[in-house]
Amino acid sequence: MNRSDTLDLSLNLMRRPSVTPEDHDCQAVMAERLAKAGFQIENMRFDDVDNLWARRGTQQPVFCFAGHTDVVPTGNLDNWNSDPFAPEVRDGILYGRGAADMKTALAAMVVASERFVEKHPNHKGSIAFLITSDEEGPSINGTVKVIETLEARHEKMTWCLVGEPSSTHQLGDIIKNGRRGSLNAVLTIKGKQGHVAYPHLARNPIHLASAAIHELCETVWDQGNEYFPATSFQISNIHAGTGATNVVPGTMAVTFNFRYSTEVTAEQLKERVVEVLQRHGLDYDIVWTHSGLPFLTPVGELVNAATHAIKTVTGVDTQLSTSGGTSDGRFIAPTGAQVLELGVLNASIHQINEHVNVADLEPLAEIYEKILEQLLA
């Protein structure tokens, strides 16, 4: 097996058990490499979260690589074929937590930047890195706090490439040029607890709310558009009752989520839900939490640079997509930056025996380098 710079750095990062919000010196490893390439290093720690802001250059335009060093928990170690934090290459496949999501992309970003700077020491504009250890967790003290800090000092990005694993069947076949918004709610329906044999003395919140819940499930919220699928409503949890078979519950809690397109706003969705609940005469409380606005980067400089780089390196004609969950791109896009996500295959992310093709690592670094060349050389 031929070793590569990208593989070696990937292994170094993957050996560090950086389960969110831990960083385990992953950012220090990256920062050391970047400092040698002329980057100014700034560590931003908020509560228990480590963040790295590194920048080479002081001028516009600014190209930023963004990503996260934290990983999700491993689950039952007995189910892994090898230690998730002792990465192994078997038959050309790199196994370990963070292989796909997203330590190999971090390594590729660093290597691409080193190579680009060596060839173009006087490149135009600036190259930056925004790296957090709070992407897989609550995302409270990570990218969003760094962005707030940068905004306060009027430090802007022009383009941002998030190294999330975007590919589906082969490297570069999909890049995410946007994401849907995410709106969560915990709805509590109030009834009156009682004995099941005396229903006239109780008010069953399950029965009371069933028609309204059915209506919410059947509602067409919008038709989507050329960039986004239609808004989806999904119930994730329902809880009611004491566990006893002879007690009518006093309350029922329903947790649900909207993944919404740019055709509606979070406020419009809230209003429509409240209208349904009130029309059905329910006594309720509802608590909303907003995880992120939808964002879209239309075809332009960044998308064109990425699609051309992918075609040059892999021969693949990439497709643009806004599917999938949220990413930290949702915190960066509102600054006005063009944002897209481009990384390795995502089939094994968050799973037992997470893995990535070793053969994809150097091409990913090449793609990142060619994007830099088109925008900053």
Curated annotation (Swiss-Prot):
Keywords: Amino-acid biosynthesis, Cobalt, Diaminopimelate biosynthesis, Hydrolase, Lysine biosynthesis, Metal-binding, Zinc
InterPro entries: Bact_exopeptidase_dim_dom, DapE_proteobac, Peptidase_M20, Peptidase_M20_dimer, Peptidase_M20A
Cofactor(s) the protein requires to work: Zn(2+); Co(2+)
EC number: 3.5.1.18
Reaction catalyzed: N-succinyl-(2S,6S)-2,6-diaminopimelate + H2O = (2S,6S)-2,6-diaminopimelate + succinate
Binding site for Zn(2+) 2: 101, 136, 350
Top-level taxon of the source organism: Bacteria
Keyword field contains Nuclease: no
GO molecular function: acetylornithine deacetylase activity; cobalt ion binding; succinyl-diaminopimelate desuccinylase activity; zinc ion binding
Binding residues for Zn(2+) 1: 68, 101, 164
Record note on cofactor: Binds 2 Zn(2+) or Co(2+) ions per subunit.
A Pfam match: M20_dimer
Residues annotated as catalytic: 70, 135
SUPFAM superfamilies cross-referenced by the UniProt entry: Bacterial exopeptidase dimerisation domain, Zn-dependent exopeptidases
The keyword Thylakoid appears for this protein: no
Gene Ontology biological process terms from the UniProt entry: diaminopimelate biosynthetic process; L-arginine biosynthetic process; lysine biosynthetic process via diaminopimelate
Pathway participation: Amino-acid biosynthesis; L-lysine biosynthesis via DAP pathway; LL-2,6-diaminopimelate from (S)-tetrahydrodipicolinate (succinylase route): step 3/3
Chain's role: Catalyzes the hydrolysis of N-succinyl-L,L-diaminopimelic acid (SDAP), forming succinate and LL-2,6-diaminopimelate (DAP), an intermediate involved in the bacterial biosynthesis of lysine and meso-diaminopimelic acid, an essential component of bacterial cell walls.
Protein family per UniProt: Belongs to the peptidase M20A family. DapE subfamily.
Assembly information from the UniProt record: Homodimer.
Name of the featured protein: Succinyl-diaminopimelate desuccinylase
Annotated source species: Acinetobacter baylyi (strain ATCC 33305 / BD413 / ADP1)
Organism lineage: Bacteria, Pseudomonadati, Pseudomonadota, Gammaproteobacteria, Moraxellales
